[in-house]
Amino acid sequence: MNADRARWNEKFRKSPQPLPSIPLLMYQGRLTKGRALDVAGGLGETSAVLALAGWSVTLVDISDLAVDRARNRARELRADVRVVQADVFRLPFRGPFETIVMTRFIERSIAGQLMRLLAAGGTLFCEQPLTGISKEYCVQPDEFRTLYADLEPVLSTVEGDRAVFIGRKKA
């Protein structure tokens, strides 16, 4: 087992089922319907919200423990979620996805990979803490606008202690 998988398994072993992202619930109407990719989707709360609202969702996470719990949660909720165990550095998808979501996770080095997977006219939703955890995992208020500069900003705001960004890829 690789070190990242072991670290995330340990985190999820101790975690109760989290609540869905409040900003995602608030702003999901601004996202493009169709196929959605939930990057580092963890226990599946974001995927379930999107699936129950009509998206065809694929969740990807490195943790075998998380993907097992996400599958079970989707089954309990009767949410149509395809769950894939994979490393975000080597996403096994061709795309395109009309929506890509990344909540409570940041990996700046995969921005180009996500842009390639995002469909023309598709939306990217990012939510990440500004403070409270290691600086490596926090973002600056407008960092997503810079990181995804090729996207047309639909929303770039701060909700409490979190930066929230929605960007649309040109059609």
Q: What are these regions, as identified by a protein language model?
A:
Residues 1-31:
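S-adenosyl-L-methionine
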Residues 34-42:
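Conserved class I S-adenosyl-L-methionine
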Residues 63-65:
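Conserved SAM/SAH-binding beta-strand->alpha-helix loop
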Residues 70-71:
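Conserved SAM-binding loop
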Residues 77-88:
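Conserved SAM-binding strand-loop segment of SAM-dependent methyltransferases
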Residues 92-99:
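A short acidic, Gly/Pro-enriched loop at the edge of an enzyme's catalytic core
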Residues 111-123:
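A short glycine-rich, Lys/Arg-flanked "PGG" loop and its adjoining helix->strand segment in the class I
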Residues 121-131:
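Conserved beta-strand signature within the Rossmann-like core of class I S-adenosyl-L-methionine
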